[in-house]
Each structure stands twice: as structure tokens, then as C-alpha cells.
């Protein structure tokens, strides 16, 4: 069985380190575990980079910078990160090249793969949820109940201004996630309880 973990980085951040611990544990069990990232900093031969040349790296960096321009049409009192995942990437092509039996999603933000592209993965999928982004609009954490009740005009956080970006992103997830079967694994009981309440999962 060949497993492919998808995440933005193999080193930076707690989510990346957790992904690599899982990967290395599987290798210790003689399971064919592989990792695909945008930011490869280790020399692990089982870790592949989606940015293998100057052009791919430039496009990846440009998409991240472009996504940050949301500040010009959306603002929120929620101090946690908001991620878009709306720009197409080369990840589906890279997945086909590696040809795994199972996909394990981890922290896939920074425009690593788009919401729509996730729905086009045609292999059994596990999603190891590191935060609330998969069940929300663009938020990585929220106190709002919109992820349970749906993102409506009347229940928008009064601390948000401008275009309702979270509603638009949530609508994209409803469209593309609902018919894309996957097994959900949460890193904590708290997150698991949140996910069980989610409209999306």
C-alpha cells in the first residue's frame, strides 16, 4: 500500500511536524509512505516537492501573495488566519505521477491545492484536520456557529466588513466537498466535537 501525505511544508509549523511524525512512523512499520509539499526543507527521499523549478516556485509564491490581497475587500475582527484555497495548482498532476493508493490531507493552505481540486482527487482519502478550516468558510478558528447553521446573510459576524468572503468560500466547500467521500481524523477531541456539528462533514 502506497500512502501520499499532502501538506504545504515538511518542516515549518506544528502541522508540518505532526505530518512528518506520522510519515516517519509509517516508514518504521515498513509502509510505503510518501509526502508531497510545496516547501521542501528536509532531505527525505520520500518527500517530493511540487515546486521543482523556478517557474513552479514563482507561481506558488505569487498565488500566496495574491491571496493576501483579500485585505483590500474583506476585514474581520477574528485575529486568526483566513485561507482561500481558490487558485489552481499542479498538485493533481503530481499525485498522478507518484500514483499512491491512499491520500492523506494535512495542512493544505497557502494555495497548495484549491477547494475544487480536492473534489477531483479520485483515490481513497483521509483528512487529518489540524484546525477548523475544513469545516468553516475561510477561518482557521471561529467562535461563530455559522459552520453549523450555514453561512447566511443574517448570521454574519458583526466584526466582519466588506465582501462576505467566508460565506463565499463556504458555498464553494458545500458545492465541492459534499460528494467527495473521505475519512476524517481530528487531532483533538475538541476538534472532533466541532467537526461532528459541522454542516459539511
Task: Report the location of each language-model feature.
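Short hydrophobic segments within beta-strands
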Residues: 6, 36, 128, 185-187
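Short aromatic-enriched loop/helix-cap "lid" or pocket-rim segments at secondary-structure transitions
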Residues: 17-18, 44-50, 117, 137-142, ...
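Short beta->alpha connector loops
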Residues: 9-11, 107-111, 190
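Short N-terminal targeting/anchoring amphipathic segment
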Residues: 92-112, 123-130
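A conserved catalytic-core segment of Leloir-type glycosyltransferases
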Residues: 28-29, 34-99
Amino acid at each position: 500500500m502506497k500512502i501520499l501525505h499532502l501538506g504545504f511544508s515538511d518542516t515549518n509549523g506544528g502541522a508540518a511536524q505532526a505530518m512528518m511524525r506520522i510519515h516517519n512512523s509509517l516508514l518504521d512499520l515498513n509502509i510505503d509512505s510518501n509526502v508531497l509539499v510545496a516547501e521542501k526543507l528536509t532531505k527525505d527521499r520520500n518527500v517530493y516537492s511540487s515546486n521543482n523549478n523556478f517557474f513552479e516556485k514563482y507561481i506558488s509564491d505569487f498565488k500566496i501573495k495574491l491571496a493576501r490581497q483579500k485585505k483590500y475587500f474583506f476585514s474581520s475582527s477574528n485575529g486568526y488566519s483566513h485561507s482561500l484555497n481558490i487558485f489552481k495548482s499542479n498538485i493533481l498532476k503530481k499525485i498522478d505521477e507518484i500514483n499512491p493508493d491512499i491520500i492523506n490531507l494535512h495542512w493544505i493552505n497557502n494555495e497548495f491545492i484549491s477547494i475544487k481540486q480536492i473534489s477531483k482527487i479520485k483515490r481513497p482519502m483521509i483528512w487529518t484536520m489540524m484546525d477548523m478550516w475544513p469545516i468553516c468558510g475561510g477561518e482557521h478558528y471561529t467562535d461563530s456557529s455559522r459552520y453549523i447553521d450555514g453561512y447566511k446573510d443574517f448570521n454574519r459576524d458583526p466584526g466582519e466588513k466588506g465582501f462576505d468572503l467566508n460565506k463565499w468560500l463556504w458555498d464553494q466547500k458545500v458545492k465541492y466537498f459534499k460528494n467527495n467521500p473521505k475519512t476524517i481524523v481530528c487531532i483533538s477531541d475538541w476538534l472532533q466535537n466541532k467537526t461532528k456539528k459541522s454542516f459539511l462533514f
